[in-house]
């Protein structure tokens, strides 16, 4: 009887710790429209539904153009907003909380200026979409992932151009 009780308690504790893990789709779903005027809430939900159904995640955006979510994992996503703008997001768990913040969302926008270079803008948010304007204690792996976003975007554009041709 005691073993059964301990087993049940262990299973309950394990399931509650899993339930607390945050994934990027939950944060993306709650994103304010003002931060990404290209996409409505329904557009964002459609992206995830299409990818979950193994379909191409392309939608008509708010400016009558086409936008496509090209990747979605538990901690990252990529969206080609149009031919000149790509958005990447990373959801990174901090090794040690910053005040009450355990996760930070990295929002990287890369504006293509020519075939080789792009202008990159990176902002940091809490999972509740409050912008963070202070130093964040990244570990080395997190820092490398953030720094790779700009180059990754440019390489993806070149690959898309080659694949279209």
What positions do the PLM features span?
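Terminal domain-start segments
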Residues: 20-96
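Short, hydrophobic/aromatic-rich segments at coil-to-beta transitions
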Residues: 74-77, 101-105
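Short loop/turn segments immediately following beta-strands, especially the blade-tip
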Residues: 127-136
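Short aromatic loop motif centered on NTY/YTY
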Residues: 135-165
